[in-house]
Amino acid sequence: MGQKINPIGLRLGVNQTWSSRWYADSGEYGRLLHEDLKIRSYVMEELKQAAISKVIIERPHKKCRVTIHSARPGLIIGKKGADIEKLRHQLSEMTNAETSLNIVEIRKPEIDATIIAQSVAQQLERRVAFRRAMKRAVQSAMRLGAEGIRINCSGRLGGAEIARMEWYREGRVPLHTLRADVDYSTAEARTAYGVCGVKVWVFKGEILEHDPMASEHRATRNDNSSSSLNRRRESV
C-alpha cells in the first residue's frame, strides 16, 4: 500500500500536517476550499521563477494568512517590498478578507521534493537529457544531506515513439515506515512530444515523536542552524 499511496497523505496526523489549516461550517466549506485552490494556482503561476515549495493558508476570524515557502524570496518581495504589496492586494481581492503574507526562505532547495520536481521538469522542457537531469538532482540531494531519493520520469522520454517510465534512486526511501520523514511531489514537463510526468520522493530521516508538525519543525530547525537566518516579511 505504501508503494501506491501519496506518502504525505499517508502520514497526515503522524508527522505531516495539512496545507490548509482552518475550520468552517458546512455551508462555507466548499467556497473556502475552492478559494484555497485558486490562491495556490495563482501564486504558483505568477511566481514560477521564485522556486515555491508550498503555500500554507490559515484563516483566523474573518482574515486570511498566507505563508509562502520559497527558495528565492527576493523575487517575491521585490524592490523595497513593492511586489509583495501588489501580491497581498491581489490576494485580498480574491478572498474578500484582510490578508497577510509571510515569506519563508528555504535554505536547502536541493532536498525539497517540490523544487527538485520543478527543476527536472524545466530541464526536460529545455531538451536536457532526462537521465542527466535525474542524476544531477539525485547527486545534489545526497550531497546536501538527504538519506535517500528516488525520481521517476514517464512519457515520451527523449522523443521516443512509445511512452515509458525511467527511474533513478540512491540511498533508501522507506515508503511503508510511518515514522520516516518522506517528502513527495510531482511536476509536469510540457515538451514538443507531449507531457512528461516527474515524481520525486526524498527521505530526510526518521521522526520518532508523534507530532503532526514534526516535519515542518525539523525543516525550520535546519534552516535556523544555517549561517544566516530565514528572511521573513509580513504585510498586514
UniProtKB/Swiss-Prot annotation:
The keyword RNA-binding applies. GO terms for cellular component: cytosolic small ribosomal subunit. GO terms for molecular function: mRNA binding; rRNA binding; structural constituent of ribosome. Gene3D superfamilies: 3.30.300.20, Ribosomal protein S3, C-terminal domain. Residues 39-107 form the KH type-2 domain. Residues 214-236 are annotated as: Disordered. InterPro entries: KH_dom (IPR004087), KH_dom-like_a/b (IPR015946), KH_dom_type_2 (IPR004044), KH_sf_prok-type (IPR009019), Ribosomal_S3_C_sf (IPR036419), Ribosomal_uS3_bac-typ (IPR005704), Ribosomal_uS3_C (IPR001351), Ribosomal_uS3_CS (IPR018280). Keywords: Ribonucleoprotein, Ribosomal protein, RNA-binding, rRNA-binding. One of its GO terms (biological process) is translation. Pfam families: KH_2, Ribosomal_S3_C. Binds the lower part of the 30S subunit head. Binds mRNA in the 70S ribosome, positioning it for translation. Belongs to the universal ribosomal protein uS3 family. Part of the 30S ribosomal subunit. Forms a tight complex with proteins S10 and S14. This is Small ribosomal subunit protein uS3. It comes from Bartonella bacilliformis (strain ATCC 35685 / KC583 / Herrer 020/F12,63). The gene is rpsC1.
